[in-house]
Structures are given as C-alpha cells and as structure tokens.
C-alpha cells in the first residue's frame, strides 16, 4: 500500500479508515498514480478512486471474527474445583490420592483461619498413620547441585521400589514476597515417576530456611504412604539449622575448591551434618574433590563426638553422571540401622516433636501480639519515640509488652 493523507480520509499502509473498522485496501497502479497526482493539487473526489467500490472487489468486507470451535476433547473443559470435606481429604490421603494430598498441603500452607482449621483436623486424623518414613534433610551452598542431586538420588530409590516425597523449600523475595518455585524443573526424571511426589514451597521469610508448615506436610506425606521424605532447604549457610530439628538424617552437599573447607573449622551447620558429600567429582575435578574430602575429614576431627555416637562420613559423587550414588545410600541405611539399634532414632524424634510444640506456641504468641488492637494503636507512637532517641529499643519493647499483657486482663 501507500501512505497518503487527504482532506477526506487517511490511507495507512494499505488500510482504509472507515468508521471504527480497518479494511485492507489493495491499491492498483492507476490508483497510486491518481493519489500521488492528487497530492500536488486540490483534492477532487473524482480523482480519488476507491477500490472497495470497484465491482472487482465485491468480496472485500470487514471480518467480524468467527465463533469458537468445539473442543476436540470435552473432558479438557475447565470446571470449578470441588471442595472436599475433612473425611474425604483423609480418605484420599490414606489411599495415596495425589490430588487430595496436594490440596491438603495447600490448606496447611495457607494463612486463612478457615483453611488452618480444616488443615489441623486433617493432620490430627493422619497422625496415627505417620512416622514410618526416613526423613532426610538436604542442604548446601547455592549452586552445589542440590536439585540435580535429588533427581539422581530419587531415581535410585524409586528403582528400588521406594515411594519418595520431595519437599523443596524455595527462597522468597524480601522485596516482593514472591517465590519462583522452580526446583521441580531441575528434577526432570523424578517428576515423571508415579511413585514420587514433588512439592515446591516458599520459605515465606521463615528463619532457618525451612517453611513453617513443612513439619505438618511431612505428616501428610507419611500418611499417604511415602516411605522416604526429602526436605531440600534454601541453602543460605550457617543459619540453616532448623532442618536438623525435623529430619532423621542431615546431608550436607559441598563443592570442591570454593573455600568451604575452611568453614569446617567453625561451629555451625557442619557439626549438624550426619554426612558431607562433595558433588561434581567428575572429569578434571576428581582430584580437587578428593582433596576437599580430605580437608573436611580433618575438620570433622575437631568437633566433639555426636549425641548418637555416629561418626559423620565424607564421600564424593557426581550427581550429573550418577557416580557414587549407591555408596551414599548404603551409608544412609547404615546410619538408620545404627541409630535404631542404639535407641537414638526414636529418642531424637520424640525430642523433635516436643521442640516443634514450643515453636508452634512461639509462633502463635507472636501472631497474637502483632494482631492485638492495643499494639496496633501504640506501635506508631513507640516507633517515633525510638527513632527520635526519646526511648531506647529495649524500653520501647517493654512498653509494648506491658500494653499487650494489660490488654489480656
């Protein structure tokens, strides 16, 4: 088409403006010549030829669109999600219905009071069927290959006939509060297995890198018949020790040549680990991985004996190539037999249950404090006093606490 502005109407790249509709206008050579000629003189309607009025273009019309085509598969039509009762949730979980399990986990993670009430009923009904799995916490530095390793570890277990649930905790943004939840995309093989359940969850700012509701989610997964539970944590470093309070075996994934061997001398996440495994021990990196393993073994000698009496081991493997995977799981099975025979396995679980009870109390008290009307009205005043140096932070905190306790009377 051509561009030509006239006093009557606008032609734009082969389209004519006609009311609110744009109609394609194929211009002939004669039309173009007439238009360019008309641009040099006063516009005359006789010189402006409209091809849409030409009998040769009787088929030219505005396409108003067509109706939606019928669906090939009517079952794909979107329907409203059905709301299950507590009894239906429990029955579905006990027969390993993944849909019921997923929706129940969503209720557990929800902050809505009505969802929390339903979730607590489901958890109480599922408790008698829980506790029969091996809970394994997996953590490590960012980029150590945790998700890829879980994919390889999981395939090894599924081939042995085990049922695996992976709870992947994804870091939430401090700015937006959002989370990518993309860990499942790096578990390509495992995500296709019917005996594997992968549930990414946001950390939601939870200290320790473990989502607050992970403990309850473990109960639901165990009731659904999963005999092995992986808890993959954010991997933020030494502050991530909360995972130790909800798992039976704590696996720390490290890399060679990153300087992390020196961190072994410090207290922290290292002394929590029941085993340290060096990933990416393949190709030209094998010698570096073996050297790093030696450094970690030397560092572990500086720690006091563990409560269980188990001596943490250091192994090397390659998650990408699947090398050394069998040796790692032989070590995990060895630990379980060791802890079960000594009675430490059951003792640790009882201690964890009590610890989480007090953690739940702390969380409930904190929520009650911040949701109090007395605190909401007093907080701005106390904050202003602190910022203008009229009060110290400790005195301001005590003033808020006094107001809260007074409101309870």
Where in this protein do the model-derived segments appear?
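Hydrophobic positions on the alpha1 helix immediately C-terminal to the Walker A/P-loop
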Residues: 149
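Nucleotide-state-sensitive switch-loop elements of NTP-binding domains
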Residues: 88-95, 103-133, 144, 153-239, ...
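Hydrophobic anchor at the beta1->P-loop junction of P-loop NTPases
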Residues: 136-138
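Canonical P-loop GTPase G-domain recognition
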Residues: 282-335
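Non-catalytic terminal/linker segments enriched in charged/polar, low-complexity residues
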Residues: 33-128, 376, 380-381, 397, ...
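P-loop (Walker A) phosphate-binding loop of NTP-binding proteins
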Residues: 141
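Long, well-ordered amphipathic alpha-helical subdomains in the mid-to-C-terminal portions
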Residues: 101-103, 316, 327-405
